[in-house]
Regions:
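Short, well-ordered alpha-helical microsegments
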Residues: 94-98, 156-157, 192
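Short amphipathic alpha-helix with an adjacent loop that forms part of the alpha/beta core around
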Residues: 194-200
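Acidic, Mg2+-coordinating phosphoryl-transfer loop and its flanking beta/alpha structural elements
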Residues: 86-91, 145-186
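Short acidic-hydrophobic, aromatic-tinged amphipathic segments that line or gate anion-handling sites
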Residues: 110, 182-191
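Alpha-helical segments flanking ligand/cofactor-binding loops in enzyme cores
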Residues: 78, 138, 157-158
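Alpha-helical substrate-recognition element adjacent to the catalytic core
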Residues: 2-113, 117-118
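Short, acidic/turn-prone active-site loops that include or flank metal/cofactor-
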Residues: 113-116, 171-175, 189-191
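Substrate-recognition "cap/lid" segment bordering the active-site pocket of phosphatases
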Residues: 95-147, 178
């Protein structure tokens, strides 16, 4: 029994923090896990920048409401779900992801939660588990699934390498060069074909 595990940002939807950085005029918020592999460090730094600028959850949600999935992402996901169980595994937060999941046809999403004060200030974050992507893939394997995984970033490498088949999708030149053994694709139809092939 196969189950496909996909990263979300950079694979199906634009990077939320990059979109927010552009809309808010705070270019330093463009830093993502592609640049900083330590997610805790990255998030604590982001929260500090938000606090410094007096920006809270509402401001970020207003931007997210205007973000659409990447062109072709919904069709790709619909096609993939027609022949595979699919779980989206992301380091994003439920409070950010809801409007985007609506636009993708409400797929199953495993992610994290923000801690938000009554005034809307994001005060912290609660990770579901340590190394959530790798931990989730291993848990699925422990209950009899063969996993196929794809993502674009450093924090996807664990689940990609631990899966029966794993692929980079629209990743950086550096990650592709550092991990030449992982097949890398740029187009949804290529990724679909690779996933189908892995299930044979």
């Amino acid at each position: 029994m196969y189950i496909t595990c996909l990263d979300v940002e950079g694979v199906l939807v634009p990077e939320i923090w990059i979109a927010f950085a552009e809309a808010s005029g705070i270019p330093e918020l463009k830093k993502t896990t592609r640049d900083e592999p330590d997610y805790d460090k990255l998030m604590n730094w982001r929260l500090g920048v938000l606090k410094e600028h007096g920006l809270g959850l509402k401001e970020i949600q207003d931007v997210i409401a205007k973000i659409d999935p990447l062109p072709g992402a919904k069709e790709f996901l619909d096609e993939l779900r027609s022949f595979s169980q699919v779980i989206l595994i992301s380091d994003t937060f439920t409070q950010f992801a809801a409007p985007l999941m609506e636009k993708l046809g409400r797929p199953t999403l495993f992610c994290n939660t923000l801690e938000v004060a009554d005034n809307g200030e994001i005060t912290g974050f609660k990770m579901r588990v340590e190394q959530s992507k790798l931990t989730t893939v291993k848990a699925l394997q422990s209950i009899g699934f063969d996993t196929i995984a794809s993502g674009d970033s450093y924090n996807d490498l664990g689940m990609i390498q631990a899966s029966k088949a794993g692929f980079l999708f629209r990743s950086t030149d550096k990650i592709k060069a550092d991990y030449p053994d992982i097949p890398a694709y740029e187009e949804y139809d290529e990724l679909l074909a690779a996933i189908r092939n892995a299930m044979k």
